[in-house]
Regions:
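N-terminal alpha/beta PP-like core and its mobile active-site loop of ThDP/TPP-dependent enzymes
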Residues: 1-123
């Protein structure tokens, strides 16, 4: 049976979403391990910059860019840039990492409690 990451990369590849911009933390390590050679990963420091870089790339490439920020705190940091991208009508696909299931039992600091609510209304 294929791994979730393999299925994910195959889907992204089929959709032409091979540019990823992010500020990885430990929760994203498995996503970045053995990162596919036909994908481009753009590393940016701090999530505001991550979304701003992705905004510019998506506009320049004239296609959606995948953005990965680091948990709920990362979404919070990115809100100003998300507002700008929303007003620019830039096609971004935003994901936020989450703590491992075992860690979620103790509600660690970086837990993303309401991941679909936090970035509203801009995502």
């Amino acid at each position: 049976m294929p791994l979730v990451r393999e299925v994910t990369f195959n889907l992204l590849r089929r959709l032409g979403l091979t540019t990823v911009v992010g500020n990885p933390g430990s929760t994203e390590e498995t996503f970045l391990k053995d990162f596919p050679a036909d994908f481009t990963y753009v590393l940016a420091l701090q999530e505001t910059n991550v979304v701003a870089v992705a905004d510019g790339l998506a506009q320049g490439l004239k296609k959606p860019v995948l953005v990965n920020v680091h948990t709920g705190a990362g979404i919070g940091n990115a809100m100003g840039a998300l507002l700008t991208a929303c007003l620019n009508k830039t096609p971004l696909i935003v994901t936020a990492g989450q703590q491992t299931r075992q860690m979620l039992l103790s509600e660690p600091f970086l837990t993303n409690f309401e991941p679909t609510q936090l970035p509203r209304p801009y995502v």
